From Swiss-Prot:
Protein's UniProt name: Putative formin-like protein 21a
Membrane-traversing stretches: none
Species per Swiss-Prot/TrEMBL record: Arabidopsis thaliana
Record Pfam families: FH2
Biased composition annotated in UniProt, kind: Pro residues: 22-61
Stored InterPro entries: FH2_Formin, FH2_Formin_sf, Formin_homology_domain
The FH2 domain, residue ranges: 124-438
Region: Disordered, residue numbers: 1-74
PROSITE patterns: FH2 (PS51444)
UniProt record similarity statement: Belongs to the formin-like family. Class-II subfamily.
Lineage of the species this protein comes from: Eukaryota, Viridiplantae, Streptophyta, Embryophyta, Tracheophyta
Gene3D superfamilies: Formin, FH2 domain
Length: 438
């Protein structure tokens, strides 16, 4: 095998190989082992800053439109020395085929036109802010006159100028201004009232006086002194007593030095009534006089029922015999005990079962005693009366009679004005203080 010839600078002359096959070059060393690592996660996206949404842009500024100033109002009408004024009907529409042109301005720098009649002025509606000094005329306004009606006919007859609009058509009539002001003037302002007590009590008192239909103070004073039941009844007197002012309010009324008409209505009533000496005491005596006969009659009726029942119980021989037998039966049953040998017993302590057994014994031995209820006719009605209420009612009557006696004693020094009051208290001379039931 001949050597390979390579020409050039890179030619290498290899020695001739002697009968051996040349070995291949050694393989390159393996690369160093690489450590297996988990792939890194992708980096997170950068945080986004939260920003508040921007407000919407403001609308483009609109040019402010300057409105023209309204024209000044026309000057007020001059005052004329006329005894008769032209009053006009409210503006109404009159049917026309074609609208009229707008009227020219009237009464600006020129006096108003006058009618042919002396003292009559034709005026047209113009805006006026002056408040009328007359009372308001209450009516239902008609804004449109129906064709063929009375108002339509009057509007057509009273047209003063043909070039005036329908809304300005006015009519002229003769009116006396001084007479109108006399009848329809507002009058002087009422004086302010000066209440002496709280408004709530004053309102309640005034409403009660209206419901009771209280008369004039002069009539009331005369009726109280004479105790005339035809003028004031018991309901009205009781209402006056309940509404009577307290001691503090009465002192305020007595010390009041202002005008009479500046007080409330009920304060005026009681200010007139305070002229009567001890008016509240006299009102109570008057009320007691009206109620006296009825109260005494009803009290005597209830008291007589109780007295009759007591008399029947004390006089019934059958009831006494029954009580005697019950006592003997009880002593026999309770012999040898602490409850035996008794002289009497309480009816409430008896047992109902024992009474049933006693009635069986009584029916077999003394049947004539079973009709004892015939001797006690008033006992059932008397059992419904309460002795405590009767005693309280009797004490009330005695207390009222004592107050009456005190008022009569005090009225002796009041002079001739209280003479009628002393004479009408006749029921005190009957001597109820000496009655045995009192």
């Amino acid at each position: 095998m001949s050597p390979v010839e390579i020409s050039g600078a890179d030619a290498v002359v290899s020695p001739p190989m002697r009968g051996r096959v040349p070995l291949p070059p050694p393989p390159p060393p393996p690369p160093p082992p690489m450590r297996r690592r988990a792939p890194l996660p992708p980096p997170p996206p950068p945080p986004m800053r939260r920003r508040a949404p921007l407000p919407p842009p403001p609308p483009p500024a609109m040019r402010r439109r300057v409105l023209p100033r309204p024209p000044p109002p026309p000057p007020p009408l001059p005052m004329f020395d006329a005894e008769v004024l032209c009053c006009c009907y409210p503006p109404t529409r009159v049917r026309r085929e074609a609208p009229l042109p707008p009227p020219p301005l009237i009464f600006v720098g020129a006096p108003p036109p006058t009618c042919a009649l002396k003292g009559i002025v034709c005026c047209f509606p113009c805006p006026s802010k002056k408040k009328s000094s007359l009372k308001r005329f209450n009516w239902v306004k008609i804004t449109r006159a129906l064709p063929g009606s009375l108002w339509d006919e009057l509007q057509i007859q009273q047209v003063c100028h043909g070039d005036i609009e329908d809304e300005q058509i006015l009519c002229a009539i003769e009116l006396d201004v001084s007479e109108i002001e006399t009848f329809f003037s507002l009058g002087a302002a009422k004086p302010e009232k000066d209440p002496l007590i709280d408004l709530r009590r004053a309102t309640d008192t005034e409403l009660t006086l209206m419901l009771l239909n209280i008369r004039l103070p002069a009539d009331m004073m005369a009726a109280i002194m004479a105790m005339d039941e035809s003028v004031l009844d018991d309901d009205e007197i009781r209402g006056l007593i309940n509404l009577f002012p307290t001691k503090e309010n009465m002192e305020l009324l007595m010390s009041y030095t202002g005008g009479k008409w500046t007080l409330e209505k009920w304060e005026q009533y009681f200010q007139e009534l305070r002229k009567v000496l001890r008016v509240e005491s006299k009102l109570r005596v008057f009320y007691f006089k009206i109620q006296f006969s009825t109260k005494i009659t009803q009290f005597k009726k209830r008291l007589n029922v109780v007295n009759s029942a007591c008399e029947e119980v004390c006089s019934s021989q059958k009831l006494k015999e029954i009580m005697k037998k019950i006592t003997c039966l009880g002593n026999t049953s309770n012999q040898g005990t602490g409850r035996g040998v008794t002289v009497g017993f309480n009816l409430d302590s008896l047992c109902v079962k024992s009474m049933h057994n006693f009635c069986k014994v009584l029916a077999s031995e003394a049947s004539d005693l079973l009709d004892v209820h015939k001797d006690l006719q008033s006992l059932e009605s008397a059992s419904k009366k309460q002795l405590k209420s009767l005693a309280e009612e009797m004490q009330d009557i005695i207390r009222d009679l004592e107050k009456l006696n005190q008022e009569l004693t005090a009225a002796e020094t009041d002079g001739p004005d209280s003479q009628v009051f002393r004479n009408v208290c006749w029921f005190c001379s009957y001597g109820y203080f000496d009655q045995p039931w009192i």
